[in-house]
Regions:
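Short beta-strand elements
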Residues: 183, 754-768, 809-817
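Extracytoplasmic/periplasmic
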Residues: 737-752
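Short beta-strand micro-motifs in enzyme catalytic cores
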Residues: 6-8, 198, 725-727, 777-779
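Accessory, non-ATPase domains that flank or precede helicase/AAA+ motor cores in DNA-metabolism machines
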Residues: 1-444, 456-472, 789-821
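Short, intrinsically disordered low-complexity segments
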Residues: 40, 761-789
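Short secondary-structure junctions
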Residues: 16, 592-595, 750-761, 805-810
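Proline-centered flexible-loop/turn and helix-kink motifs
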Residues: 153, 165, 593, 680, ...
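Inter-lobe coupling/hinge segments of SF2-like helicase ATPases
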Residues: 277-286, 290-294, 303-740, 769-771, ...
């Protein structure tokens, strides 16, 4: 009796959600030692056996009679995912309706991703003459052969497509393959490789090297200089050796040939982030901070997971508590992850934490170059860095011995991914802490209503910092009624009160931050005579005027166009309506012509490193005014900022989302908290057309407890989280009637299946706020319920059915759990 062949269960990259499952593959004997859980492999998949990437989930043995395809090759020398991260990927699939490989893809840095590249190779038995003879008179086939021979007999498809420009080479390639002239295969190509540097070192003793240098002093002075430098430094990079001695590569190679030196390849890490060189003592904690630190740390025993909510007013010193917690974990030999909601916050956090932990810090966020992010990932995985700072995806950092995850500003919606997998970093952090028996700390001045409710119910441990550090006062806040400004003849976006306070700040050498949550210059360009407006041809939205680029832009699909000199319909005068950050900047430059102003929004920070550059300018050059979107509302700590202005509070409040009140309260509270963080008292001005709104009033007083008491009752009445979960099923297609037909079927099916459940309510179909994006109509069915296994199974089945049914051809259906919009 023969042993059953070894097999592996593999999550395949090419599998869509409706066919996704662990696929069984046979492990060839030659690969038996290399195929282990967590490594990526190349496997044939589908009817055409197309080669695709996959990741090994587990190993097993084949049942008798099973006919299995074999693994073609192994891509990784060691696992890229630990067993814990594999379990997390499977869990994300169940919770967020994605494929396992979607989750794996989110966990790995782009530098590790592979592309399957098609390659066309000249078949054996063909030379140049016989190949061209087989191609005959076809100009396209001859052009393909020109490229193949120019590439040495094997040419990637991407190069052929570039050669053909606007014409596809597919027909010519198919013909040459059919004639037996070319054969096609695929190969794996990684986006970025390990960075290596050539190092030169002696292979003899220093005494022997000096003797050799003396002998070469006259006949080979450059070789002599190289040997003397190597005696001093022991090892030096090839480029530095040549630079400091003036030697060429031939001189160094001559030493290698003589057996006096050797050249080796050393791996180096690409790192662009500047870190503090001086190590500082840990910050001194006040009584409140120490109580919070000791209370949270006491929950850690290494055998049980624990979650805490650290609620502290703006400026209360939550960051100092984080520093002490991370230091305590390092002393225990444990790794820590600190999550921040915005890339703009990472430079400040790096500056603070590197002053305490030096090179033990790694940074992960999307603005890093591909090679830099890959190298930071490697530093974490190999244990060279035990403190990780990053945005949402840093929750997947490959830390071994994880002891702590901190989510700063945990209420922020940016912790929820908008693309598959549509995970929330808080949920992923909970899973990782539960798997590693680690501490989870959620920190905020305005905690998420659901988090505060869980703390109230004892699910989270609650720790509170009620006072600003060093007994500093909260900013004094003034609400300006913009209706009165209009009645007084001021139709601009800046009230007279705010302009006066800006001038006062400038005269005192103090700085100001102005917050407006809309980029661009004008949200609407319209004709004053016929009413014509510029709208996107692909989306159901108006185009936004960007004065910097002098273009009209769609913020949904990216469509742009130039602005006409006059109305294209009637030739009338075009007017701009609405205010964005660019228009606000223009207005202030007119009102304050000699004052330097910085702007921080998605348009100004698009180049890599722009966040840090703008914030460094603001800090070091004491630029008087910083204008920005929500990037400037949280986490920034500038002691010289004594004035904050909220340009339009109403813009935050009235947006048709059940979380609008919470988001408005949080943003206003956070941005007001940027003021008065140093020795000087702070002020804040909130401009609004609805000063009587209770949310704006409570935000101005920084009354979180009052806001929470009202908001939690409203959520209870609306049956919104935390009293139920929300699952949305979104349907999109170019044909609106197909979307509505599919949505109606989904709604009716859910109602039928859940008829006996009192906790379930189905709403819709309803159009999304922007119903058409990129020529696709979008409608949604919303389900309020308890998100249990029955619901997950039902929704998953509907996704599979509707995405594969012939009657819904061209329709795309996806689901989301507790979306943020």
């Amino acid at each position: 009796m023969t042993d059953s062949p070894a097999t592996a269960k593999i999550a395949v990259a090419a599998a869509t959600y409706w066919v996704d499952r662990p696929f069984d593959y046979r492990i060839p004997p030659a690969l038996a030692d290399k195929v282990v859980p967590g490594v990526r492999v190349v496997v044939p998949f589908g009817g055409g056996n197309r080669r695709t990437e996959g990741i090994v989930l587990s190993l097993g043995t084949a049942q008798s009679g099973m006919r299995l395809k074999s693994i073609a090759s192994v891509l990784d020398a060691s696992p890229v995912l630990s067993p814990e991260m594999i379990r997390l990927a499977v869990w994300l699939r169940e919770r967020y309706f994605c494929t396992v490989y979607d989750a794996v893809h989110a966990m790995l840095p782009a530098g590790l991703w592979y592309q399957m590249e098609s390659v066309y190779t000249l078949c054996a038995g063909f030379d140049r003459e016989s190949a061209y003879a087989a191609a005959g008179k076809s100009a396209q086939e001859q052009l393909v052969l020109d490229a193949v021979f120019a590439h040495g007999g094997s040419c990637p498809l991407v190069d052929l497509e570039r050669l053909f420009e606007n014409v596809s080479p597919a027909r010519a390639l198919q013909s040459l393959v059919r004639k037996g002239v070319l054969e096609t295969d695929s190969r794996e190509k990684r986006r970025v490789g390990d960075k290596k540097i050539r190092m030169v070192s002696l292979t003899v003793s220093a005494e022997d090297a000096l003797l050799a240098a003396d002998r070469r002093e006259k006949r080979a002075p450059l070789q002599s200089a190289c040997l003397r430098l190597l005696c001093t430094l022991d090892r030096v990079s090839f480029s530095e050796l040549c630079y400091f001695t003036g030697a060429s590569s031939s001189s160094v190679n001559a030493l290698v040939k003589a057996g006096l030196a050797e050249i080796t390849q050393d791996e180096v890490f690409r790192r662009s982030v500047l870190r503090s060189e001086e190590q500082s003592p840990l910050p001194v904690l006040n009584e409140e901070q120490r109580a919070a630190f000791e209370g949270i740390l006491s929950l850690y025993d290494g055998e049980h997971a624990s979650a805490s909510l650290l609620y502290g007013v703006t400026g209360s010193g939550k960051t100092s508590v984080y520093v002490h917690l991370i230091d305590a974990m390092r002393r225990k030999g444990k790794a820590s992850i600190l999550l921040v909601p915005e890339i703009a916050l990472t430079p400040q956090m790096i500056r603070i934490f590197s002053s305490y932990f030096g090179d033990d810090i790694a940074v992960l966020h999307s603005s890093l170059a591909v090679g830099e992010r890959y190298d930071e990932w490697k530093r974490i995985k190999t244990g060279r860095a035990r403190v990780v700072i990053g945005t949402r995806s840093a929750v997947f950092a490959p830390c071994s011995d994880l002891g702590l995850i901190i989510m700063d500003e945990e209420q922020e919606y940016t912790y929820k991914s908008e693309n598959s997998p549509r995970y929330h970093a808080r949920d992923a952090a909970k899973f990782r802490c539960a798997s590693s028996n680690a501490l989870l700390v959620l920190g905020s001045a305005t905690p998420d209503v659901e988090s505060r409710y869980r703390a109230e119910k004892g699910v989270y441990h609650l720790f509170t910092l009620k006072n600003r550090f060093n007994a500093r006062q909260l900013p004094s806040v003034r609400i300006v009624d913009m209706r009165q400004e209009l009645r007084g003849g001021n139709g601009s976006e800046v009230s007279g009160v705010l302009l006066h306070e800006l001038r006062e700040n400038i005269s005192r050498g103090e700085q100001s931050i102005l917050f407006l949550n809309r980029r661009g210059a004008a949200s609407l360009v319209a004709c004053g005579e016929c009413g014509y407006t510029y709208s996107c041809p692909h989306c159901s939205v108006n185009l936004t005027w960007h004065s910097v680029t002098r273009r009209l832009v769609c913020h949904h699909c990216g469509y742009t166009r130039a602005l006409d000199d006059a109305c294209p319909e009637c030739g009338g005068l075009l007017n701009q309506f609405g205010t964005g950050t660019q228009k606000l900047e223009e207005h202030l430059r007119e009102a304050l012509p000699d004052v330097e102003i910085l702007r921080m929004d998605a348009d100004s920070v698009s180049p890599a490193g722009s966040h840090e550059k703008i914030l460094s300018q603001f800090r070091e050059k004491k630029v008087p005014i910083l204008i920005g979107t929500q990037m400037v509302t949280k986490g920034l700590d500038f002691e010289n900022v004594t004035l904050v202005g909220v340009i339009s509070a109403d813009q935050l409040l009235y947006c048709g989302d059940y979380r609008a009140g919470e988001r408005c309260f949080s943003l206003i509270t956070q941005v007001v908290g940027r003021s008065g963080r140093g020795a000087k008292p702070g002020r804040a001005i909130i401009q609004t057309f609805t000063p009587q709104n209770p949310v704006i009033g409570m935000a101005s007083r920084q009354d979180y407890e009052g806001f929470y008491a009202e908001e939690i009752e409203l959520r209870r009445l609306q049956n919104c989280p935390p009293f139920s979960d929300i699952v949305t099923v979104t349907v999109s297609a170019e044909d609106e009637s197909s979307v509505l037909r599919c949505c109606t079927y989904i709604r009716d099916r859910i109602r039928s299946e859940l008829r006996g459940r009192k906790d379930a309510a189905v709403l819709g179909p309803a159009p999304l706020p922007v119903v058409r994006v990129s020529n696709r109509y979008r409608y949604r069915v919303t389900l309020h319920c308890r998100f249990d296994k029955e619901i997950r199974t039902l929704v998953s089945g509907l996704l599979i059915q509707c995405n594969t049914a012939k009657e819904y051809k061209g329709v795309l259906v996806f689901a989301d759990y507790n979306p943020m919009e």
